[in-house]
UniProtKB/Swiss-Prot annotation:
SMART domains documented for this protein: EFh
UniProt keyword NAD, yes or no: no
Protein name in the entry: Myosin light chain 5
Originating organism: Felis catus
InterPro entries (UniProt xref): EF-hand-dom_pair, EF_Hand_1_Ca_BS, EF_hand_dom, Myosin_RLC
Miscellaneous comment as given in the Swiss-Prot or TrEMBL entry: This chain binds calcium.
GO molecular function ontology, one term from the record: calcium ion binding
């Protein structure tokens, strides 16, 4: 048994392991877990890879059903191969290099705002936060909303909220 492992390592397996493990050293363990949850949510057919159908299903679950095939193809072409979890981490590592936390939060909100209005219905956000990935409690969401600007129609200004979440105070106009 040990000789098989040794042969595998001598055959280049170790080099591949080193290359793939570098991406894991770029993130904290909690971040890797969050990426794993995001990957699992996107891997709709649970085959360990994100493909075009997974992307379509993910967009549909976010209410965006008019995404074009060429847009999906362009997203998939950003990867240098099939998008397994390691490739997913590599892609996000490259995208997040040089971005700050506020920009990252804003980009997440923008995914839920296909019209680019700068606001999202607070009830919709509350449902998502309580049902997806690291599920928040109603109390946690309500506590976050205390720092949010919400208009009379119930729309949350996510740009202002992103600023408060990352800087701890409202931006002075």
């Amino acid at each position: 048994m040990a000789s098989r492992k040794t042969k595998k390592k001598e055959g280049g397996g170790l080099r591949a392991q080193r290359a793939s493990s570098n991406v894991f050293s770029n993130f904290e363990q909690t971040q890797i877990q969050e990426f794993k949850e995001a990957f699992t949510l996107m891997d709709q057919n649970r085959d360990g890879f994100i493909d075009k159908e997974d992307l379509k299903d993910t967009y549909a679950s976010l209410g965006k059903t008019n995404i074009k095939d060429d847009e999906l193809d362009a997203m998939l072409k950003e990867a240098s191969g099939p998008i397994n979890f390691t490739m997913f981490l590599n892609m996000f590592g490259a995208k997040l290099t040089g971005t700050d936390a506020e920009e990252t939060i804003l980009n997440a909100f923008k995914m839920l705002d296909p019209e680019g209005k700068g606001s999202i219905n607070k009830d919709y956000i509350k449902r998502l936060l309580m049902s997806q990935a690291d599920k928040m409690t109603a109390e946690e969401v309500d506590q976050m909303f205390q720092f949010a600007t919400i208009d009379a129609a119930g729309n949350l200004d996510y740009k202002a909220l992103s600023y408060v979440l990352t800087h701890g105070e409202e931006k002075e106009e």
